[in-house]
């Protein structure tokens, strides 16, 4: 039987691309700002 090869980890996603991580740096805040301007429903992963 074949195995699923992609196992996403929630903790890593949160640490890398969560909202609070984005807000820490200037570039991260720019990402949030751009997504707000575009009208994204989800600004960050978590």
Swiss-Prot record:
Entry-linked InterPro entries: Ribosomal_bL34 (IPR000271)
Alphabetical list of Gene3D superfamilies matching this protein: 1.10.287.3980
Keyword annotations: Ribonucleoprotein, Ribosomal protein
GO cellular component: ribonucleoprotein complex; ribosome
GO molecular function: structural constituent of ribosome
Ribonucleoprotein among keywords: yes
GO terms classed as biological process: translation
The keyword Transcription is annotated on this UniProt entry: no
Superkingdom as given in the UniProt entry: Bacteria
Family: Belongs to the bacterial ribosomal protein bL34 family.
UniProt protein name: Large ribosomal subunit protein bL34
Organism the protein comes from: Trichodesmium erythraeum (strain IMS101)
